[in-house]
Amino acid sequence: MEKINAVITGVGGYVPDYILTNEEISKMVDTNDEWIMTRIGVKERHILNEEGLGSSYMARKAAKQLMKKTGANPDDIDLVIVATTTPDYHFPSTASILCDKLGLKNAFAFDLQAACCGFLYLMETAANFIRSGRYKKIIIVGADKMSSMVNYTDRATCPIFGDGAAAFMMEPTTEDLGVMDSILRTDGKGLPFLHMKAGGSVCPPSYFTVDNKMHYLHQEGRTVFKYAVSSMSDVSAAIAEKNGLTKDTINWVVPHQANVRIIEAVAHRMELPMDKVLVNIEHYGNTSAATLPLCIWDFEDKLKKGDNIIFTAFGAGFTWGAVYVKWGYDGKKES
């Protein structure tokens, strides 16, 4: 029996129309464009500012584009998984809402929560469903409305984040392509450094939690930066060595778009020139689970069938990892 691999056969993406610039941010908090660009690398970020719209809205836009580009029949979709830290509701899952919006009658669906590392976990999870031989078409989506949890009076965090979504189609192949390997890690000791204080079962919503701004993202930036650099660098180097990849045979690295200095540090550790590293943080900011697929959406036309790509990310938990992918097709599929 031939080995079944899980290959990426298409990508779709969406970012909201409204753009929040550094100039506008500087009117909210004590900062400026030069500081934000130098320290974070963000020039602008897209914000979903229409009332009553959440992550499922952006996920639907991305997935609809994906299905059009790949020519997928809604009845043929077996599974939908959404990685998000900003679900529409605590329940039901954003994935189930997305299935309804896409008219998928034969798919089952669930959410996956691994913060900014969510899409890495999605790729490995979906790949294993494909490898089982029981599933033929899987849509995976990273979607986050980070503006819903950002405190726009906190100069340390509000310049960093944006909203967006992107999706991959994953299908079986017997070619030597697709998700080839992964190294995924978790360390729950990271809780104090990156979390939302209230809103869960430990500290349910109350007048007190709202009045004390406990429903916003809390991040201890210096600690997170240090862990992100070391973790992403180490795991990227490890997966390259494990698979016999060198700086010459790696075609692309797709890092989580959290901070341009983290991205540059990972490239330096891997001895890779920055022209092999996909970077779009300047225009989107950190869209959490959406950063990795949004990078592919932006740079799809650069990719060639058989390209060796290392995806790497770091997020709350702490969660981190790397996924090695051999790309499945040439160039950009038109929508």
Swiss-Prot record:
Pathway: Lipid metabolism; fatty acid biosynthesis. It is an enzyme of class 2 (transferase). Pfam families: ACP_syn_III (PF08545), ACP_syn_III_C (PF08541). InterPro entries: ACP_syn_III_C, ACP_syn_III_N, FabH, Thiolase-like. One of its GO terms (cellular component) is cytoplasm. Its main location: cytoplasm. Keywords: Acyltransferase, Cytoplasm, Fatty acid biosynthesis, Fatty acid metabolism, Lipid biosynthesis, Lipid metabolism, Multifunctional enzyme, Transferase. It is found in: Cytoplasm. GO terms for biological process: fatty acid biosynthetic process; secondary metabolite biosynthetic process. It catalyses: malonyl-[ACP] + acetyl-CoA + H(+) = 3-oxobutanoyl-[ACP] + CO2 + CoA. GO terms for molecular function: 3-oxoacyl-[acyl-carrier-protein] synthase activity; beta-ketoacyl-acyl-carrier-protein synthase III activity. The active site is at residues 116, 256, 286. Residues 257-261 are annotated as: ACP-binding. It comes from the Bacteria. Its EC number is 2.3.1.180. HAMAP family: FabH. Belongs to the thiolase-like superfamily. FabH family. The last Arg residue of the ACP-binding site is essential for the weak association between ACP/AcpP and FabH. NCBIfam families: fabH, PRK09352.1. Catalyzes the condensation reaction of fatty acid synthesis by the addition to an acyl acceptor of two carbons from malonyl-ACP. Catalyzes the first condensation reaction which initiates fatty acid synthesis and may therefore play a role in governing the total rate of fatty acid production. Possesses both acetoacetyl-ACP synthase and acetyl transacylase activities. Its substrate specificity determines the biosynthesis of branched-chain and/or straight-chain of fatty acids. Homodimer. This is Beta-ketoacyl-[acyl-carrier-protein] synthase III 2.
